[in-house]
Amino acid sequence: MANITMKELLEAGVHFGHQTKRWDPRMKEYIFGERNGIYIIDLQKTLKMFKDASKYVTDMCAQGKVILFVGTKRQAQDAIAEEANRCGMYYINNRWLGGLLTNWVTVQKSVKRLQELDEMATDGRYDLLTKKEVIRLERERKHLQANLAGIKNMRRLPDAIFVVDSNNEAIAVKEARKLGIPVVAVVDTNCDPTVVDYVIPGNDDALRAIRLFTSKIADSVIEGVQMVGDKQFAAEMEGVNTDVQAVAEGEEAPAAEVAAPVAEAAAETEDVDLEAALGGGIRKSPAVVNALDEAEAAESL
C-alpha cells in the first residue's frame, strides 16, 4: 500500500474543510476544530483512514480486480485522467451518465459505438462519405469521447470506485451502493460519510489535495498490480531453479517482511500536534461540541 505523511497532508492543505455553516453533523468525528469560521479536519484520522483505504485498493488489485476513478469537478478532471492512465485503470472525469453502472448493458452500446467511430476515423471510411456526413459523425464521436473515453476499454463493471467529493458524485455513489460495489472516497466536512465504505477525510476542493490523494491511490493500484505480476512470475519459475528460489525465500523475503512492519509502524506513530503545526488559534466549534454532547446523551438513554 502507498504511504502518506503528515507533512504531505499539511502542505497540500488537506486539513481545510468547509465553512462551519456548511457541514454535515455525521462528519463530527473527523473534525479537529475550527478556525476563522472554517472547520479543520483531524489529519491523524486522515492518516489512519487513508492507510485502510490504500491497503484495500492494493489488496483488490493484487487479486486482478478493477478500480474506476471518478472525479468530474473541474479541479479533479486532470488528476483523475492522468493518474488513472498512469496506473492502467479506468476513469470518468467529465460527466457521470445516469445509469452508467446500473444500466451497464445500455452504456456498453454507446462504448461500442465510440469504438466503431474511432475505427472509421482511422481506417479511411471517412473518405467515402460526404463532408456533411463526416461532420455529423465527428460531432457524435467527440460527444461520446468526452463522456466515455476513460471507460472505452472497460469490459465489465468495476470491482470498486474511487471518488473525489462524494457529494458531487452522489449519483455514482448511489449506483455503486445499489450494486454492492465498494466506494473509496475523499470526504469533506459537508459530506455524508455513511454512504462511503472507505472514508478518506480531507479537502476535496484544493488542487494539491486532490492530486495528492489521487496519485497515492494510483500508487496503491500499481503496487497491487505488481503483486499480480510477481505471483505469475513465481508460478512460472516454480520448479525451474529451486536452489535460487530457496535462497530468495530464505534471505530476501524476511528482509521485505521486516521492512513492511517498520514502514507501517512509522505511519501509525506519526504523532503531530495539529494545533502547533497550524499555528494555533484553533478551537472546538460549538456546533461540533453540541453534536458530540447530543450523541453522548442519546447513547446514555
Swiss-Prot record:
Record-linked PROSITE patterns: RIBOSOMAL_S2_1, RIBOSOMAL_S2_2
GO molecular function, one term: structural constituent of ribosome
Alphabetical UniProt keywords: Ribonucleoprotein, Ribosomal protein
Disulfide bonds: none
GO cellular component: cytosolic small ribosomal subunit
Superkingdom classification of source: Bacteria
Keyword Transcription regulation on entry: no
A Pfam family matched in the record: Ribosomal_S2
Protein's GO biological process: translation
CDD domains: RPS2
The family this protein is said to belong to: Belongs to the universal ribosomal protein uS2 family.
NCBIfam families, sorted: rpsB_bact (TIGR01011)
Official protein name in the record: Small ribosomal subunit protein uS2
Organism listed in the record: Acidobacterium capsulatum (strain ATCC 51196 / DSM 11244 / BCRC 80197 / JCM 7670 / NBRC 15755 / NCIMB 13165 / 161)
Taxonomic lineage from the root: Bacteria, Pseudomonadati, Acidobacteriota, Terriglobia, Terriglobales
